[in-house]
Amino acid sequence: MADVHELLDTWIENVTDEELLGELKAMREAGDEDAITDAFFQELAFGTAGLRGTLGAGTNRMNIYTVGRATQGFADYLVKNFENPTVAIARDSRNKGELFVKTTAAILAANGVTSYVYPKISPVPTLSWATRYLKRSGGICMTASHNPAPYNGYKAYGPDGCQITSEAADAISAAMNACDPFKDIKTMDFDAAVEQGLVKWIDDEVLDAYYDAVADKSVNNLTDEQIANAPLKLVYTPLNGTGLIPVTTVLNKVGITDITVVPEQRDPDGDFPTCPYP
């Protein structure tokens, strides 16, 4: 890679996102060598788990440019290996998730790849489900799993709903390495992509089918009446993530309705104020 200061200058010259540009200029004006080095000493590596890193400006950060580079690499891989490729996309409650989803879908659309997007936050398993249920060529989920709040990530999935193989990851990584984030990424307006049918919304039927499938897998030898009369009480916390609706929906389906949700951790919040490591 180029010198970190050269990379900083290149990014300042090319970045159009105002928030990231402000961060870059502040770095340079402060002469913060530690911050500059940490932001640019490497590029986020793409592997079988995709990308993961802290949010911010630089090659070693999760931002629309590093996400864009990964998406262009994934698009190149899909176009090469699938006829009329399609992708399912989801995001959890982490910060910048919606921005990254729209960035990703717009780039895929510009490459001729149609995206099927969950309109609201969804847990990772629902992305795997949609990829298989809708018979898509791949899937992408914006999530950083258990990492602290400053992180986000970009997980890529194969048509089987599993994380991509090492062979696929290597091919995507090679395509990324040949991609300049400011010159080589194809993109288009997100709303235009929706209007042209290159971005479609995943409807509730897909989630309903998922909930039914999970409920059908429950191990239960009791009748509905026995379940209703059982003194079973649960305490549950979504940890400010995406689990509230899916978990309580499935529990209700199998007859468990007396559920106390921890109020401080009930609602989605990408800052995870009560749980530094969700």
Q: Model-derived features: where do they sit?
A:
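An N-terminal, well-structured beta->alpha segment
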Residues: L8-T104, N111, A193, V199-L234, ...
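N-terminal small/polar loop signature for handling phosphorylated ligands or for N-terminal nucleophile
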Residues: E83, A88-Y151, K253-P278
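Short, glycine-/Ser/Thr-/acidic-enriched flexible segments
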Residues: L51-G53, G58-N60, R94, S122-P123, ...
